[in-house]
Amino acid sequence: MIDEIRDLLSRRLPGYEVGSVARLGEGLDNAAYEINGELIVRASREPAPDRRSASTRREADLLAAVHEFSPLPVPEPVFADPEAGVLAYFKLPGIPLMQHPVADPAKLAPALGGFVGRLHRTRVGKVEALVGRDFDPPTAWREGAERDYGEIEGHLSAAARRLVSGFLGRTPPAAPRAAAFCHNDLGAEHVLVDVGGSAVTGVIDWTDAAIADPARDLALIYRDLGAEVFDLTLAHYDGGRFDEADRERAVFYARCKLLEDVAYGLSSPGAFRYAGTSLAHLARTFA
């Protein structure tokens, strides 16, 4: 893949000298590479050419739109190659929160709350041509969580199994009443931070952005940063009404997504950090 990236850059950025190419890692949707310590090249893992091309083109157009109103920095594409499924942009400041936890995560709450609130206030008509709708009901989420639990149960302690089994035995929350524009994958791997200052410096990977339940964005803050930072984030959130039913769904999604990350991390080469991070957060997320 590195040779393919070199060839692609020679065609799309003529005159740009490629010195170093470093693989940064991969997630569920994409693999990322760093060029010369300054340029990020992200390659889609989608195997279907038509879907890969459409997704890459859509995300490039979406980033241009989001850049106009996001209160936090987002990638600005240098080029997109839909056929190859590649998007390139110069690095934003900061490093992924998943890899480098901050000393005082509470300091992240104002920026996260303001950011998520601004996304959720976006007029749906402004972005609906660029994103899909993602409305799997909570019952479908629980079915997915049950499958993931079946894959990972043997890796959990007895105490963790009791927590997860209790969760899966309860009735899922009611379906959401409202929809909003969501990043839809606002996990710690996609939040960039200044570790020394405990500050958010950007948000990356908009592949999964959709019109969806607003609780979906807040759910991953609960999963990755805990209930206290979640509550502080809500104190700075102005994206619309967010009541106890919304909170219940956010916690529900957080638990389902944690199980998904454990299953992914245990089954995918090079992705164990997803499992390790989620296992470390399991007790507090299911408490």
Task: Name each region found by the language model.
Residues I2-R6, A60, D231:
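Short, surface-exposed alpha-helical segments at coil->helix boundaries
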Residues D29, F69, V74, E83, ...:
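FAD-dependent flavoprotein oxygenase/oxidase catalytic domain
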Residues G19-A140, E153-G154, A158, P176:
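ATP-binding pocket architecture of kinase catalytic cores
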Residues G25-I35, V41, P77, L168-R216:
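Active-site acidic catalytic loop and adjacent metal/ATP-binding pocket
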Residues P82-A84, V195-S198, L258:
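Short strand-connecting beta-turns/loops that link adjacent beta-strands
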Residues M1-E17, P93, A109-P110, R118-N184, ...:
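An alpha-helical support segment within catalytic cores of ATP-dependent transferases
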